[in-house]
Swiss-Prot record:
This is ORC1-type DNA replication protein 8. Keywords: ATP-binding, DNA replication, Nucleotide-binding. Involved in regulation of DNA replication. GO terms for molecular function: ATP binding; ATP hydrolysis activity. It comes from the Archaea. The keyword Nucleotide-binding applies. Pfam families: AAA_22 (PF13401), Cdc6_C (PF09079), Cdc6_lid (PF22703). Gene3D superfamilies: 1.10.8.60, P-loop containing nucleotide triphosphate hydrolases (3.40.50.300), Winged helix-like DNA-binding domain superfamily/Winged helix DNA-binding domain (1.10.10.10). One of its GO terms (biological process) is DNA replication. ATP binds at V66, G67, K68, T69, A70, Y218.
Amino acid sequence: MVDVNENPFDGTDSIFERKQPLKKDTFTPDTIFHRDEEIEFYINALQDVIVGHDPNNVFVYGPTGVGKTAVTKWVRDKLEEKAEAEDIPLTVVGPINCRNYRSAYALVNTLVNEFRDPENQLPESGYSTDSVFEFLYEEIEAVGGNVLIILDEIDNIPADARNDFLYELPRAEANENTPITDAKVGLIGISNDLKFVDVLEPKVKSTLGEREIKFGPYDATELRDILGYYADIAFREDVLGEDVVPLAAAFSAQERGDVRQGLRILEKAGEYARMEGAEGVTEAHTRRATDTIETDELLDYFEHDLSSQQALTYLATTLALIEPKHEASTKRIYNLYSSIAESSGRRVKSERKIYEFLDQLSMQGLVRSAERNLGRKGGRKYIYEVTDDPTDIINAALQSSYSDAVPSNVNGILEHYLEDEATEFEAPDTTDDEQQNLWQFT
């Protein structure tokens, strides 16, 4: 029974000291762990700013949650600090997250407004793309000196818009039709897709002349150090059981080597302890958090980390895997992708694009592939599988904005799949037409 005379918000938080460090996207650490080599590459690439040369274009690759943005912010801060001490003109814009930009116009519009005062902001529409590029060049020339523009998740910008932007900006200094004469422009692009540059148009790649820095997943030992650092800041003294951080690190390492996932586990475990009124966070709280965090994590991928085409491909791969045939070939994935995209009113891309989407999902640790030799038939084909439990993926899809793409009879097919897995039953091969008729698309 609730005592109406007491305010339920009275009292203090006995578990958390401050939760911001657990929100990795909004917190910049003052210590960087296990990225010395990547930082050295970064410093080498940006040293030209300090010694008086034009800034290099730098592209940073790696899966989510492996320190790309944190390291970039840290290096940015150190570069600005050194430039100020040496009286070197330097303006840094960003990181700007590109997740929601669907055109070069929208991105350039935002960049213009980053340079402008609040009372002189450019409206979201009303100009041509050439005009907003011209406004950007004017702003860059106005500040002069070295200008570094940092774009996070640059791979989320649609290909046409990406090619337009990455072709125009780096050549602005050399283009006599722009007002840039004194400023020197460099671009830092952060991408979850290792093959990001490979799919750019040849003229764009030639213009960029970029330096590349690649970030790999963390292992369990590295994650323990990193999560321990964040936990010391986020939690009150002596509330964490000794197994909490190692368990969160081990789980995250098994999944994707992702710091972000480990931080979510710690936050969720702390919330469970607080809800119970416990004195501290235990191993049991942490295990409970790992059980619930998987669907939350996958839902976040559907809603935030994946483009719509990647999300549909991910769902199609999962559906192909749980069919009686239990084989997610590229052809089968594409057939399912086409069906769910069409049935949900979304654009259907070409079969060639499926390879690109699957590569991107593989880079993010969501799918993996195996090459199969077709023997006397000749040739090879790739078979894909998802790295998470298909049940969790489908549950996440049903809770996401892609629920309309999930076949209405998915639970029945999933139930048969789980029964087959439990009994090690091997279903007979079926034709593509028979497989296609399994699903009920609305």
